[in-house]
Curated annotation (Swiss-Prot):
Keywords: Developmental protein, Differentiation, Phosphoprotein. One of its GO terms (biological process) is TOR signaling. Residues 106-115 have a biased composition (Polar residues). Residues 21-46, 73-115 are annotated as: Disordered. The keyword Phosphoprotein applies. The modification Phosphoserine is found at S9. Belongs to the PPDPF family. This is Pancreatic progenitor cell differentiation and proliferation factor. Probable regulator of exocrine pancreas development. Residues 22-32 have a biased composition (Low complexity). The keyword Phosphoprotein applies.
Amino acid sequence: MAAIPSSGSLVATHDYYRRRLGSSSSSSSGGSAEYPGDAVLQSPGLPKADPGHWWASFFFGKSTLPFMTTVLESPERSAESPQVSRSPMTCGLTPETMKQQPVIHSGQTNPRDLS
């Protein structure tokens, strides 16, 4: 049988979650009769329906987040396998820059290292 520490940390955790779950039924000031000094502060600019993600509106504003939307496949592409590019990644280099850079394979020496 596991020993429960008598330091009070388990009681403090229980009280925290009990206050957190009971905060929806507290008075308009944010406090409660059971815990008069514990007021849950609510910013006037934040929606009350989603208090757990206040940081999303802080960083991203009120716009919708396109990267969090559901991605749907089109019917004509659902039967195909995903397309994989066989070309090397250029990392934003222009074709002119790619022509100037020599391709060095393993086992070859770099002409720039010789000078």
